[in-house]
Design a protein with these regions (language model features):
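Active-site neighborhoods and metal-handling regions in enzymes and metal-associated proteins
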Residues: 1-219
Length: 219
């Protein structure tokens, strides 16, 4: 994205005609669906930083700490360990706040028996990673453990279903049907996943509405 001023400056400096054709945007976005080997390397580097940060937070999270402080610790660790920026604003939420898909970290203190959800990603030379993980603090209830294991099983089943040449919505259906079949009909609020690259949300997406066929090189 650019400002109008930047657009005019670019047009003047290059002495070119800028085409106002909406379809060109779709052509470019489609080309970006397939990542080059160099792009894949950058995304893997971003994800390696994210993985390392997650393992770090497992040693940090404990009862009495505040969501906002933990968010800052997570951000600092990624930036200190090779991230050239944050892929997006980190979400770190506990207890009831963690049940919100896009929670805002606040001064909520972590308690024994809480789930803590982290949605975060590193940027590396312009390319993004994105990972969501939920961890338990101390002993949790049987219901919490049941739901956690169900979501984990649905995630792993979705991953196992991915291969080239299938509709994206068929992957979403694998995980969604497991959740619904366990008695949580209507509780799957989002799509299963989305592509990423230069932007944190790119196409195609593992959602009920996306019929795009998967191809090698998509992330």
């Amino acid at each position: 994205y650019m400002t109008v001023e930047s657009l005019f400056s670019l047009r003047k400096a290059l002495n070119v005609t800028i085409l106002d054709e909406p379809y060109l945007n779709e052509v470019i976005l489609h080309q970006r669906c397939i990542k080059s080997p160099e792009e894949l390397e950058e995304i893997r580097a971003a994800q390696a930083i994210t993985d390392k940060a997650f393992l770090h937070m497992l040693d940090i999270i404990k009862p009495g700490l505040v969501e906002k402080d933990l968010q800052l610790e997570l951000d600092y660790f990624m930036l200190k360990n090779g991230a050239t920026g944050l892929a997006f604003e980190t979400i770190l939420a506990a207890g009831a706040n963690g049940s919100m898909p896009h929670a805002v970290p606040g001064m909520n203190k972590i308690k024994e028996g809480d789930f803590v959800t982290m949605d975060f990603g590193a940027a590396h030379n312009g390319y993004c990673s994105d990972m969501t993980r939920t961890v338990a603090v101390g002993k949790i209830s049987e219901e919490q453990e049941k739901v956690y294991n169900l979501v984990l099983a649905a995630q792993l089943a979705g991953i196992d279903a991915v291969r080239a040449g299938i509709p994206c919505n068929s992957v979403d259906a694998v995980s969604r049907n497991m959740i619904y079949g366990a008695g949580y009909e209507g509780k799957f609020g989002h799509g299963l996943g989305h592509s990423l690259g230069l932007e944190i949300h790119e196409n195609p997406r593992f959602s009920p509405l996306c019929t795009t066929l998967t191809e090698a090189g998509m992330v």
